[in-house]
Amino acid sequence: MGSKVMMFKWSKNITPSQVIKLMRAEKDVEKSMAVFDSATAEYANGYVHDQSSFGYMVLRLVSANKFKAAEDLIVRMKIENCVVSEDILLSICRGYGRVHRPFDSLRVFHKMKDFDCDPSQKAYVTVLAILVEENQLNLAFKFYKNMREIGLPPTVASLNVLIKALCRNDGTVDAGLKIFLEMPKRGCDPDSYTYGTLISGLCRFGRIDEAKKLFTEMVEKDCAPTVVTYTSLINGLCGSKNVDEAMRYLEEMKSKGIEPNVFTYSSLMDGLCKDGRSLQAMELFEMMMARGCRPNMVTYTTLITGLCKEQKIQEAVELLDRMNLQGLKPDAGLYGKVISGFCAISKFREAANFLDEMILGGITPNRLTWNIHVKTSNEVVRGLCANYPSRAFTLYLSMRSRGISVEVETLESLVKCLCKKGEFQKAVQLVDEIVTDGCIPSKGTWKLLIGHTLDKTIVGEASDTLLRDLDI
């Protein structure tokens, strides 16, 4: 990373702490690097960076994801005979882990000896944790095996990471439990993290009774459960339809002064909504807000989905408004839930209003929600045909302009609507457009056209047009 040298009037007795202070004052990493470089320019009275100023600059570069510059800087440290500490090298490893580049973390780890740094237990555990976090489990197991082969003894930290790796898959959870049972024999007493990891793994694969037993053991051994432990258990209980028991754990954790987080509340709301208790989930939502815990996208999606499923559409709409006020933008999938909810209670005009709001707001369906959007749009048009034919036709035109295919049933509803109004020629034109788009009308549509004929000449001309388009 090149930087333009900034012209500072440095004092005669410049110190690394002064340089760090100036670098810290620069929010832009390139300007901070320019300060760093200027300190060693010719006019700077022979100042040489030490480990603290080098280390600070490496951290700044890593934080800005400028990894090449950070690695170049540690090479410069070595050239200038400045000791490259393990902590500086690990900061680069962690940075690569943060941006999901585990192989680069491993590469830097293997370069440690090039900088006269013999990796410690801490270094091994740090890289092992990165490999597990990035789901490089086979590599993690080999890495752990290498730790043991070079004579590094197991520690609580290293065994915790290994157990976490084993708890990622249903088939290896028992191996994780086996290591847990053997920990005391190896002089490693399980801690809160050990128990929490196992409880989370057991719950993930539906082994709730075992998780509860382990939780009880944890408390009996004065190993304090954390909010993560409680949340894992609550989520597991909700997933196995034991919502009331999960609610009791919520009360228990609050009584112990452990504040539930957004994931705790969202898990419970999901369980309540799936149990048909969306209003109770709303009460929990209000409690969550009162305690200063801000809901996230998952929270709102869970509640709105549950409310719409129980046809409590007004409550869902109010929640959507609150979501917007919080600065969270509903996606096409969430709008689709509300629109479908209105359709379920035959409020098609309101459904159309929300569809318009979604389109005007620039909210477009993605690959996953496109089919639902097509289905919902067609459903709204069909519903509008009975009492709001003009609105139905406007929405139909909007659908065509946005490339949304018109279903056969929707075409039939529109034709029926137009024929009922006596707009037969318009109905024929509509069918003509749809046929051109590649949609084949149903027998019902043909019968409607013929059945509502008032002028046989018009019918004959229209039929000829349609048959010609169909190449019959």
From Swiss-Prot:
* The name this protein goes by in its record: Pentatricopeptide repeat-containing protein At5g46100
Establish whether keyword Kinase is in the entry: no
Q: Where are the PPR repeats?
A: 50-84, 85-119, 120-154, 155-190, 191-225, 226-260, 261-295, 296-330, 331-365, 373-406, 407-441
* SUPFAM superfamilies, per database record: HCP-like
Q: Does the keyword Nucleotide-binding apply?
A: no
PANTHER family linked: PENTATRICOPEPTIDE REPEAT-CONTAINING PROTEIN 4, MITOCHONDRIAL-RELATED (PTHR47938:SF35), RESPIRATORY COMPLEX I CHAPERONE (CIA84), PUTATIVE (AFU_ORTHOLOGUE AFUA_2G06020)-RELATED (PTHR47938)
- Origin superkingdom: Eukaryota
The organism's taxonomy opens as: Eukaryota, Viridiplantae, Streptophyta, Embryophyta, Tracheophyta
NCBIfam families in alphabetical order: PPR
Give UniProt keywords alphabetically.
Repeat
Q: From what organism does this protein derive?
A: Arabidopsis thaliana
Per the record, the similarity remark reads:
Belongs to the PPR family. P subfamily.
